[in-house]
Amino acid sequence: MLEQMGIAAKAASWQLALLSSREKNQVLEKIADYLEAQTDDILRANAEDLAEARANGLSEAMLDRLALTPARLSGIANDVRQVCNLADPVGQVIDGGLLDSGLRIERRRVPLGVIGVIYEARPNVTVDVASLCLKTGNAAILRGGKETWRTNAATVKVIQQALQECGLPAAAVQAIESPDRALVGEMLKMDKYIDMLIPRGGAGLHKLCREQSTIPVITGGIGVCHIFVDETAEIAPALKIIVNAKTQRPSTCNTVETLLVHRNIADTFLPALSKQMAESGVTLHAAPSALPALQNGPAKVEPVKAEQYDDEYLSLDLNVKVVADMDEAIAHIREHGTQHSDAILTRTLRNANRFINEVDSSAVYVNASTRFTDGGQFGLGAEVAVSTQKLHARGPMGLEALTTYKWIGFGDDTIRA
């Protein structure tokens, strides 16, 4: 089955690579329109997935990732339209010039070919990936989690209808609907057809892909994110940022999981934090350095366990640790962070610059929420993933991350001397 999907996807990718920006945008507009026109069908499939997920005891964080609503689906359709408005990187000349030999050389952006994506309970990923791949002239083979197979199937059906309406092969976007886990292992060996593989899920999935894939893999998306409250931070705006970073949507990978507080501000800051977290329903997991200032406050407090510093909670839980100085804060982030998103709250430019230079994450913030690490927020449009590695892409992966380049030489009957 996968062999035939790979053959069809590769053939579709050659056709997609030749489309003009106008033609690709027409497809995307059609997809957005069809998503809205067939909202009821997609939501019906999603409701069935949700019912089965609840019966199987999925956590509230996972259920939130799985759920679609009319508003969320409308937002997904609008995200597709936003991709239409983005500049098409395909065909862009990156650099070049005339060589001494008389050869004119240029480096030009081209599609990667076929993108494989393995993801868990995030039905929006289906549309995000499809829209970005189509905009960049790539075909896509998608393998969503078993929790969302009905939603994914309904969504891909809509996308394929739009493709065929525009005279393009349905195989440009395909989904592996079978829940058979053995197919994941088979997909990881499809380097003959798939040019890049992107896993979006937990640490286990990323480890599996790194160890078993014969396809180049982009890993990331696991976010043990930190905020360091410097001694010069202002309490009121700092609390506002922390509430946003923890509670706006706790199930996302750019949510803060550990708060590091400079000891010189801790006695004033931690009681205010406890009050704010109690109002927000956040459970604090306190280090011994933070526990005395928090245990009599209104927020629910538990002693932190050492292994929790490595946890991506995806829930209303927050580790809190008082640190002696920035050295200790940076050391903690280096030991426990996942190079996703980390922030410093400070009013000192020197401290801000030091944090920027010494914290090796794909996104580093000064006086801002970690929740901004997102393709849409960065002006990239919908993202295909957030990469925490350094090759071939880093941070939110927008359109350019789904392209490669080729060297083109123009001669006048030119030969090498």
Curated annotation (Swiss-Prot):
Compartment(s) where it occurs, according to its Swiss-Prot or TrEMBL record: Cytoplasm
Keyword set, alphabetical order: Amino-acid biosynthesis, Cytoplasm, NADP, Oxidoreductase, Proline biosynthesis
Keyword NADP among record annotations: yes
Record EC number: 1.2.1.41
Recorded catalytic activity of this chain's protein: L-glutamate 5-semialdehyde + phosphate + NADP(+) = L-glutamyl 5-phosphate + NADPH + H(+)
Primary site of residence: cytoplasm
Pathways per UniProt: Amino-acid biosynthesis; L-proline biosynthesis; L-glutamate 5-semialdehyde from L-glutamate: step 2/2
Top class in the EC scheme: oxidoreductase
Signal peptide limits: none
Family matches, as InterPro entries: Ald_DH/histidinol_DH (IPR016161), Ald_DH_C (IPR016163), Ald_DH_N (IPR016162), Aldehyde_DH_dom (IPR015590), G-glutamylP_reductase_CS (IPR020593), Glu-5-SA_DH (IPR012134), GPR_dom (IPR000965)
MF terms in GO: glutamate-5-semialdehyde dehydrogenase activity; NADP binding
GO cellular component: cytoplasm
GO biological process, alphabetically ordered: L-proline biosynthetic process
Function: Catalyzes the NADPH-dependent reduction of L-glutamate 5-phosphate into L-glutamate 5-semialdehyde and phosphate. The product spontaneously undergoes cyclization to form 1-pyrroline-5-carboxylate.
NCBIfam families listed in its UniProt record: PRK00197.1, proA
Name of the protein in question: Gamma-glutamyl phosphate reductase
